[in-house]
């Protein structure tokens, strides 16, 4: 969220104090009307005996205050900035009744924070500080209260009335209105409050828990979208079953609801028992969603459901502890998706995909001006801290804990965490302590104070590795060293605890040694005896720590790892290193040339290594697709001291062109072998086959552009027209667009005509064009033209992200134009968005924080 004028108060973690008052119960009554919603808030409040007596300060924003009563009597109050201050309150420790009546205008709430209207339905978003836009309150996560909510609205217009917890009463009122009363049996902070009202339909499923309890699961959507909710429901059922099986955490409500809305700033929100989702993470059908969409829905449904325990039952003491719930829950959703994937190879693919996100999004954040620890020490605006560091790096910190105590030990630690803290608002320290205390003999327990540097220090550590082989003694020594560069406000870094999973490979592919070493000092040396020949070290297997590995592999060593390593992650990593090495060399050679791709030649050993992967009968298609995809332009840029986005783009495109031309026959064979996956199912095996077929098509279209061949573009266009599922259709369309073929234009027009009524599919259509390779500076004019398209609406966050973010944040070669026109466009859009939705504007502003 961009800073408002005059907003300069820095909040410090070290200055945390408990609230001066506790709120035990909240009884909210809403008379819902888009133009004027009335909110009656009755609270049972008591002084906190541990804090010196002081006035009660309640947060509120954009509210019209009508009355304030204490124990049924009028009372004096004053406004200080955005706070309602009450000084004349009953003395002593007895609880008192506080009643506040306010009104607000949901129809004018374009920020989509608090209570707002979308498609003639009411929705809420309260995390982090949205509840204060609904009523005056102690809007902080350590104030946990029991909520009763009564909703009243016009029945014909808003037939469905939902809130947190269990429905206890509903009925008709006069004048065509009706009501519903909801009681949440669990205490919660205000950020987990939610209400929904509107014309919605739902898919229902009754389930029975392991303990024999019955639960009702519901997925609510707009009429017409019900046929796209089956996968979301299946994902929810799988999430409930998995959390109970893996961690012994059952569903604790009679019903659990998901509601989808197309106007949503986030991906989804874990409000207790009433999750509100962006439609992007609920709606899917074979015709409208790709394999990636299906996988994302499974992951996000899991993530929000898992918050029911890690975030809701145990919440954050303050917002500095955000990773307590988010890092842990990202880890849980990653484990869920890996467990559902089943096969070891599919688990490895999921792990590689997660690491790819971390390295292309989080590593740059750690290396830039926005670098901050997983648990920040200060903030100006909390909404700006919903970052890949807090989420994805936070998940890696939790994963290292599991590595250090073992999977069973981690489950024991989770059980102790809930035993100690259920119903409380706690800290990252409390969580780490519980995992360590449950495993007193573990290295985590022994190293806990040092391990917590992962929470307090920003930046990505670099781990150096130097091997030496003594042929006479048959001894191999491996020296490891760690270093972390200064980050803003943290010039000196203390050593981290780095779990290093390793193996030693012989040149013929035999594994000579394997194990786990925990690096705790600046340098450390490992010695291996009876090693018959000079080994190739395979380090940080499975990406056992979120660090950058600095080691001088030869090409032959990398080719050995790519061919033989038993760790799939390091096989993939070897291919990435081979490609990266060539990209960096070519960028240096071609930095002053305008079109590097035309002059570029790749060496035969590299091409043959890729060819052998493509031909390997024992490797999964999904794994091949990952290995054969070059490092992203963003990741390449991170390896360079001087970044020239145009040169990076030209070299990467030139490398793709060479791989397309030199491996053309193999790409044809791969496409023919994987083009038909039978009846559609988004499982890992079939998804991997479609992904490899799509990658093959994109290379065949690239080769055709160079050779003048018309056959493969024609086949691709036919594939686009005939495809029975969105994955194959969109892969074909992407191949035509990314190769710059003339058939891209009719294909884009046909795609729009087919899906003009499907909002999420149109988002793909806009995104594909905003993210297209820039051949001659034509992407920005295309983006400006698309902003005038009748289907473009900048006020819808999904649509704004699809076009503007795809260009500014995901297309560096096109965005960082030498004439700065990309920056002009970016600044115009940030200012335009900030006028009505500061949160989306703040996200866009970060396109330039690297």
Language model: regions and residue ranges:
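Short, hydrophobic/aromatic-enriched beta-strand segments in well-ordered soluble domains
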Residues: 41-45, 60, 94-109, 147-155, ...
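A surface-exposed beta-strand-loop module
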Residues: 48-118, 139, 174-176, 519-534
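Beta-strand-rich binding/interaction modules
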Residues: 50, 64-71, 444-449, 460-539, ...
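Hydrophobic alpha-helical and helix-loop surface patches within well-folded domains
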Residues: 182, 213-472, 477-478
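Long, ordered, helix-rich scaffold segments
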Residues: 360, 387, 529-850
């Amino acid at each position: 969220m961009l800073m408002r004028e005059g907003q300069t108060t820095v909040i410090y973690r070290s200055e945390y104090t408990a609230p001066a008052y506790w709120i035990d119960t909240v009884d909210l009554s809403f008379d819902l009307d888009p133009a004027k919603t009335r909110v009656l808030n009755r609270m049972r409040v008591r002084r906190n005996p541990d804090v010196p007596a002081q006035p009660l300060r309640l947060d509120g924003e954009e509210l019209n205050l009508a009355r304030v009563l204490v124990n049924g009597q009028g009372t004096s109050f004053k406004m200080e900035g955005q706070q309602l201050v009450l000084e004349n309150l009953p003395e002593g420790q007895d609880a008192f009744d506080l009643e506040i009546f306010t009104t607000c205008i949901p129809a004018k709430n374009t920020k989509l924070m608090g209570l707002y209207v979308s498609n003639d339905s009411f929705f809420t978003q309260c995390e982090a500080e949205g509840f204060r836009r609904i009523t005056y309150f102690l809007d902080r996560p350590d104030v946990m209260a029991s909520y009763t909510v009564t909703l009243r609205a016009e029945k014909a217009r808003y037939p469905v009335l939902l809130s947190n917890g269990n429905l206890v009463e509903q009925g008709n009122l006069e004048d065509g209105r009706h009501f519903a009363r909801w009681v949440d049996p669990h205490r919660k902070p205000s950020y987990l409050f939610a209400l929904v009202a509107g014309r919605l339909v739902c898919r229902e499923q009754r389930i029975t828990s392991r303990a024999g309890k019955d639960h009702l699961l519901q997925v609510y959507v707009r009429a017409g979208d019900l046929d796209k909710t089956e996968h979301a429901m299946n994902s929810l059922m799988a999430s409930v079953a998995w959390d109970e099986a893996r961690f012994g955490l059952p569903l604790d409500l009679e019903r659990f609801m998901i509601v989808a809305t197309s106007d949503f700033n986030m991906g989804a929100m874990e409000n207790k028992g009433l999750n509100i989702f962006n439609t992007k993470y609920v709606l899917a059908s074979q015709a409208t969603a790709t394999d990636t969409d299906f996988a994302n829905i499974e992951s996000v449904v899991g993530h929000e459901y898992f918050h029911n325990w890690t975030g809701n039952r145990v919440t954050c003491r303050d917002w500095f502890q955000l990773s307590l719930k988010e890092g842990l829950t990202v880890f849980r959703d990653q484990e869920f998706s890996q467990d559902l994937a089943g096969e070891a190879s599919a688990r490895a693919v999921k792990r590689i995909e997660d690491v790819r996100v971390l390295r292309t999004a989080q590593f740059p954040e750690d290396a830039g001006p926005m670098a901050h620890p997983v648990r920040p020490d200060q903030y100006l605006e909390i909404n700006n801290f919903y970052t890949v560091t807090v989420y994805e790096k936070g998940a890696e910190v939790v994963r290292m804990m599991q590595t250090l105590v073992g999977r069973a030990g981690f489950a024991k630690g989770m059980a102790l965490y809930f035993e100690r803290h259920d119903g409380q608002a706690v800290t990252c320290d409390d969580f780490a302590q519980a995992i360590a205390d449950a495993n007193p003999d573990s290295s985590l327990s022994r190293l806990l104070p040092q391990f917590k540097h992962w929470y307090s220090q920003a930046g990505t550590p670099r781990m150096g590795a130097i091997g030496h082989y003594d042929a006479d003694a048959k001894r191999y020594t491996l020296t490891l060293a760690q270093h972390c560069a200064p980050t803003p406000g943290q010039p000196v870094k203390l050593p981290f605890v780095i779990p290093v999973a390793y193996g030693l490979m012989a040149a013929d592919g035999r594994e000579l040694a394997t194990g786990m070493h925990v690096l705790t000092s600046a340098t450390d040396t490992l010695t291996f005896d009876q090693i018959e020949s000079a080994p190739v070290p395979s380090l940080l297997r499975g990406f056992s720590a979120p660090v950058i590995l600095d080691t001088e592999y030869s090409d032959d060593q990398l080719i050995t790892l790519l061919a033989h390593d038993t760790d799939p992650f390091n096989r993939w990593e070897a291919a990435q290193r081979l490609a990266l090495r060539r990209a960096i060399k070519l960028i240096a050679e071609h930095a002053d040339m305008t079109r590097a791709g035309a002059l570029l030649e790749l060496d035969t050993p590299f091409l043959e290594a890729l060819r052998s992967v493509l031909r390997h009968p024992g490797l999964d298609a999904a794994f091949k697709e990952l290995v054969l995809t070059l490092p992203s332009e963003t990741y390449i840029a991170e390896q360079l001291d001087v970044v020239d986005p145009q040169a990076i783009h030209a070299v990467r495109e030139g490398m793709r062109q060479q791989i397309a031309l030199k491996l053309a026959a193999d790409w044809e064979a791969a496409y023919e072998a994987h083009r038909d996956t039978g009846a559609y199912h988004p499982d890992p095996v079939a998804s991997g086959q479609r992904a490899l077929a799509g990658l093959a098509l994109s290379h065949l279209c690239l080769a055709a552009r160079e050779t003048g061949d018309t056959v493969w573009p024609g086949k691709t266009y036919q594939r686009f027209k005939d495809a029975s599922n969105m994955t194959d259709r969109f892969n074909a369309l992407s191949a035509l667009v990314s190769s710059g073929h003339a058939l891209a234009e009719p294909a884009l027009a046909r795609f729009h005509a087919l899906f003009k009524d499907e909002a999420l599919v149109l988002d793909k259509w806009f995104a594909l064009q905003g993210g297209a390779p820039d051949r001659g500076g034509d992407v920005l004019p295309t983006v400006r033209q698309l902003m005038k398209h009748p289907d473009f609406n900048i006020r819808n966050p999904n649509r704004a992200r699809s076009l503007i973010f795809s260009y500014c944040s995901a297309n560096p070669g096109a965005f960082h134009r030498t004439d700065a026109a990309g920056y002009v466009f970016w600044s115009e859009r940030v200012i335009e968005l900030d006028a009505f939705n500061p949160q989306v504007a703040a996200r866009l502003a970060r396109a330039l924080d690297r």
